[in-house]
From Swiss-Prot:
The chain crosses the membrane at residues 29-46, 118-133, 142-156, 197-218, 274-288. Belongs to the reaction center PufL/M/PsbA/D family. The D1/D2 heterodimer binds P680, chlorophylls that are the primary electron donor of PSII, and subsequent electron acceptors. It shares a non-heme iron and each subunit binds pheophytin, quinone, additional chlorophylls, carotenoids and lipids. D1 provides most of the ligands for the Mn4-Ca-O5 cluster of the oxygen-evolving complex (OEC). There is also a Cl(-1) ion associated with D1 and D2, which is required for oxygen evolution. The PSII complex binds additional chlorophylls, carotenoids and specific lipids. Pfam families: Photo_RC. PSII is composed of 1 copy each of membrane proteins PsbA, PsbB, PsbC, PsbD, PsbE, PsbF, PsbH, PsbI, PsbJ, PsbK, PsbL, PsbM, PsbT, PsbX, PsbY, PsbZ, Psb30/Ycf12, peripheral proteins PsbO, CyanoQ (PsbQ), PsbU, PsbV and a large number of cofactors. It forms dimeric complexes. It catalyses: 2 a plastoquinone + 4 hnu + 2 H2O = 2 a plastoquinol + O2. The record marks 161 as: Tyrosine radical intermediate. It is a multi-pass membrane protein. This is Photosystem II protein D1 3. It comes from Nostoc sp. (strain PCC 7120 / SAG 25.82 / UTEX 2576).
Length: 360
């Protein structure tokens, strides 16, 4: 009898917990995906903040030349970054318990892998939570579909690219200048400017920004006039009011006369579908482009220059791009001349299991 009551009590407790988790009456919806989202997002955020501020230098190239990335080791808010996991680790999972000591884990860039993997799980869970809440409210699932674009982009640069290149050390650094460094280096190594998927991605991002600005300005400008012709159209309106003032007929007429008749939408749903689909599809293609270039299926490379009748080169944009790519790649390969001494010498060199002391 006691066992039966305990089982019924625990089942009732679980039922109440499930009802609270999935309740749409809460101030903030948690959901079953939220149970996964909260711990992973908190872990990624806390480790990122600690590493950004105080992580010691990381041997990112695997040749015992540590790179400083944190604020306390000489960087400012622009140059500070979480340095990727060392090339010596490659694609191996590198949790704290796999290292001989905490110093070794930090020296090999363990925080980067910890942040990235928890962050990716968190954004997948956030997308699932969007679907879950939409389902509970009886809505259609287009919000998580739209959010899948930035999720795909983050997955491409933080996971697919390191897998394709064979090491987490090739992943995007987690900082402002680190992000720009990743972009600049990506160009010469994969000729991204000549990749059609990147071109579609650029059109999606910039086109989406343009269409968003056009739509916002039209909505703000087209008022349902409630004044006479001798009064200002702005009379009686205030910024942020609840009452709708947008007149799609006026917007359609204005835009149709500004460009041409069929350039404007006369249906609000088709307009907003277009505004959502354009940037989402563009970012999908950008993520797909990064993923294909991860495995070195690179952009077009026109190596054969155009020659005139005397055999002299007629420079094209492709030639200029190739020269720029070579220059950037040479600048980036800071250790190309420096063969690791432990491989060059005949004697076996001892392997340091603890981070070396950094002179202040």
């Amino acid at each position: 009898m006691t066992t039966l009551l305990e089982q019924r009590s625990s089942a009732n407790l679980w039922h109440r917990f499930g009802n609270w988790i999935t309740s749409t009456e809460n101030r903030m919806y948690v959901g079953w995906f939220g149970v996964l989202l909260i711990p992973t997002a908190l872990t990624a955020a806390i480790v990122f903040i600690l590493a950004f501020i105080a992580a010691p230098p990381v041997d990112v190239d695997g040749i015992r030349e540590p790179v400083s990335g944190s604020l306390l080791y000489g960087n400012n808010i622009i140059t500070a970054t979480v340095v990727p996991t060392s090339a010596a680790i490659g694609l191996h999972l590198y949790p704290i318990w796999e290292a001989a000591s905490l110093d070794e884990w930090l020296y090999n860039g363990g925080p980067y892998q910890m942040i990235v993997l928890h962050f990716l799980i968190a954004i997948y869970a956030y997308m699932g939570r969007q679907w879950e809440l939409s389902y509970r409210l009886g809505m259609r699932p287009w919000i998580p579909v739209a959010f899948s674009a930035p999720v795909a982009a983050a997955t491409a640069v933080l996971l697919i690219y390191p897998i394709g290149q064979g090491s987490f050390s090739d992943g995007m650094m987690l900082g402002i200048s680190g992000t720009f460094n990743f972009m600049i280096v990506f160009s010469p190594e994969h000729n991204i400017l000549m990749h059609p998927f990147h071109m579609i991605g650029v059109a999606g991002v910039f086109g989406g920004a343009l269409f968003s600005a056009m739509h916002g300005s039209l909505v703000t400008s087209t008022l349902v006039r409630e004044t006479s012709e001798v009064e200002s159209a702005n009379t009686g309106y205030k910024f942020g009011q609840e009452e709708e003032t947008y007149n799609i007929v006026a917007a359609h007429g204005y835009f149709g006369r500004l460009i041409f008749q069929y350039a404007s939408f006369n249906n609000s749903r088709s307009l907003h579908f277009f505004l959502a689909a354009w940037p989402v599809i563009g970012i999908w293609f950008a993520a797909l482009g990064i993923s294909t270039m991860s495995f070195n299926l690179n952009g077009f490379n026109f190596n054969n220059s155009i020659l005139d009748h005397q055999g002299r080169t007629i420079d094209t944009w492709a030639d200029l791009l190739n020269r720029a790519n070579l220059g950037i790649e040479v600048m980036h390969e800071r250790n190309a001349h420096n063969f690791p001494l432990d491989l060059a010498s005949g004697e076996v060199q001892p392997i340091a299991l603890t981070a070396p002391a950094i002179a202040s």
